[in-house]
A protein has these predicted regions:
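Alpha-helix C-terminal capping segments
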Residues: 70-71, 89-97
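Conserved PLP-anchoring active-site segment centered on the Schiff-base-forming lysine
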Residues: 93-111, 130
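Short acidic loop-to-helix transition motifs that present clustered carboxylates
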Residues: 84-87, 130-135
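A glycine-rich helix N-cap at a beta->alpha junction
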Residues: 118, 122-129
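Conserved N-terminal alpha-helix of the aminotransferase class I/II PLP-enzyme fold
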Residues: 31, 36-85, 110-117
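N-terminal glycine-rich, Lys/His-bearing helix-loop that initiates the first secondary-structure elements
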Residues: 1-48
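Conserved small/polar residues in nucleotide/adenosyl-binding loops
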Residues: 137-139
Length: 139
């Protein structure tokens, strides 16, 4: 297994032809060109791997995600643009279906909005509680 320092520099990226840059290039684009309509349709239906629109992924972000997964010994990683997006994705993955979440009563306002407004749309009930109040704990 490669050393940690080696993984930090090389994991998740293989230089590609024609130029074979040692450092991953930064792809500053929002959209990608397709060789034909059929390929584009297949990629948008998620039947063929590839990049369609940078909000859902691009080669630069893919290198970062692959490198992070390798460094953490994981099978994959998801990069988000904000902490709020990371919180939402994590909780929604855990709270699929009609679930109930007990949350700390003193959260960031944006998180409170997420939990009370957005999560209600997904059928997730949220109760806010002060964890220092032991009378709220029922076994």
């Amino acid at each position: 297994m490669p050393r940690h320092a080696t993984q930090q520099v090389h994991a998740g990226y293989e230089p590609a032809a024609p130029h074979r840059p040692v450092v991953p290039p930064i792809h500053q684009t929002t959209a990608f060109r397709f060789p034909d309509h059929a390929t584009a349709a297949s990629m948008f239906r998620l039947e063929t791997p590839g990049f369609t629109y940078s909000r859902t992924g691009n080669p630069t972000v893919a290198v970062f995600e692959n490198r992070l997964a390798a460094l953490e010994g994981g099978i994959g990683a998801i990069a988000t643009a904000t902490g709020q997006a990371a919180v939402a994705l994590s909780l929604l993955a855990l709270l699929q279906g009609d679930k109930h979440l007990v949350a700390y009563s003193q959260l960031y306002g944006g998180t409170v909005d997420l939990l009370t407004d957005t999560f209600a749309d997904f059928g997730i009930e949220v109760t806010f509680a002060d964890p220092a109040d032991l009378s709220l704990i029922h076994i």
